Amino acid sequence: FKSQIIMKAGEDPICVVTSDFNNNGYLDLAVLNYRDQTINIYFNSRFGNFKKTGITLRPGKIPINMVSGDFNRDGINDLAVTMRYHKVMILLGKGKGRFKNPVPIKVKGQPTAIVVGDYDKNKILDIGVALAGSGKTGVQILWGVGDGTFESSNIIKGGGQPLTLANIDVDNDGYDDLVSSSNALHSMTLIRNNRNKTFTTLKDFASGSFPKFVVVADFTGDGRADLAVSNPTD
């Protein structure tokens, strides 16, 4: 790699996502800052650098994690932010890196990790949310309606206190399944998509004392998804 480029962010940046927020064909950045509870937007300069814009978003109190996707199918990318107190905030994009005011979606536990996928194959993005801490624990799917709103589902049990969530096709059926981590059980949990808007928890398997982050990829080139898991305490 070339020398690093340092860009000024807010206080305690904890999450960064890439997306084309100004629709010029280049990936931009959105950075979630935990301490000052803001999101900063950085436009791609097209020369290996990013320019911090004057756009500052305020999703709400105690943001935890963030993803991007086009939730209302208008060709403009949006943001979804998990909040500590049983909410996911949806910020619909208006173009040119600007967003509408956040709209809350209540979930049944304390949300930690969040992923985006089309779990029912209807060409509308859905959201998977890991729930841990206070309230109920497990994984909850927010089914996309197509206009930026979502329908909640029952909690998928299993996996203890999930802190990480990722999409994975474990059975090669073309549908995204899920894998979550649990520091309480020191394990990873596979959750199979039944292709009818329900999921089945398959099994837990050991993955170190404190599995915190997971990456899914085909590392062996055999057409099957593999996992790489980080453990900060091992």
Regions found by a protein language model. Give the residues of each.
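Blade-edge motifs of beta-propeller repeat domains
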Residues: 1-11, 43-61, 79, 92-109, ...
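Extracellular beta-propeller repeat domains
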Residues: 2-4, 24, 38, 183, ...
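Beta-propeller blade termini
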Residues: 14-21, 64-73, 112-121, 163-172, ...
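Inter-blade boundary loops/turns of WD-repeat beta-propellers
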Residues: 21, 34, 44-46, 71, ...
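Glycine-aliphatic tripeptides that mark coil-to-beta-strand junctions in extracellular
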Residues: 25-27, 75-77, 123-125, 174-176, ...
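Hydrophobic beta-strand segments that make up the repeating blades of beta-propeller
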Residues: 29-32, 79-82, 127-131, 178-181, ...
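A short loop-to-beta-strand structural motif that recurs across blades of beta-propeller domains
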Residues: 38-41, 87-90, 138-141, 187-190
